[in-house]
């Protein structure tokens, strides 16, 4: 039976309960404090049973930096989007300004540039074995220029 729950992903929801825990589409790395990013992976490890798996899907830092589009303008109907991206303080920052007729909105997001070695070190500290590493959603082998960094870990 599939069910959905809202909770803080930095805290373990149910300890040693699940056979698989997923963190997909770069939903980690948004916290300013590194301890919080670590806590997310720790809670994932705590939530799965022994010999069960966690999966983390993150963007590949090298690929993002290499292909970074620093600014662009998009228009959908009468709404105009001005998007700016840049790297600062080991984070990728995206600012979006939206103009909808006479209304103007803006927001920004920032994501830590977490590389493969970061995840390997965290896995080691938490007793997670890195079982597989993929570079895209077709599960092709991870390369330095891969689009994604998809890690399959097993709780020991």
Protein language model features and the residues they cover:
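A short, glycine/Asx- and small/polar-enriched loop/turn
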Residues: 16-19, 92, 144-149
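SAM-dependent methyltransferase
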Residues: 55-122
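A short glycine-rich, Lys/Arg-flanked "PGG" loop and its adjoining helix->strand segment in the class I
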Residues: 36-53
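C-terminal lobe and adjacent flexible extensions of AdoMet/dcAdoMet transferase-like proteins
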Residues: 116-156
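Conserved SAM-binding strand-loop segment of SAM-dependent methyltransferases
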Residues: 1-14
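A short SAM/SAH-binding and catalytic strip from SAM-dependent methyltransferases
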Residues: 18-35
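A short, aliphatic-rich alpha-helical micro-motif
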Residues: 15-16, 41
């Amino acid at each position: 039976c599939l069910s959905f729950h809202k909770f803080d992903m930095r805290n373990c929801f149910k300890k040693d309960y699940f056979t698989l825990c997923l963190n997909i589409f770069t939903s980690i790395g948004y916290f300013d404090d590194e301890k919080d990013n670590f806590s997310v992976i720790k809670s994932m490890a705590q939530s799965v049973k022994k010999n069960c798996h966690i999966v983390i899907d993150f963007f590949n830092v090298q690929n993002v930096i290499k292909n970074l589009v620093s600014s662009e303008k998009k228009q959908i109907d009468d709404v105009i989007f001005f998007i700016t991206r840049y790297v600062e303080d080991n984070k990728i920052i995206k600012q979006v300004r939206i103009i909808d007729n006479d209304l103007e909105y803006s927001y920004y997001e920032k994501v830590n540039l977490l590389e493969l070695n970061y995840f390997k070190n965290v896995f080691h500290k938490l007793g997670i074995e890195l079982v597989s590493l993929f570079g895209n959603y077709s599960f092709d082998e991870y390369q330095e220029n891969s689009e994604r960094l998809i890690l399959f870990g097993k709780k020991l």
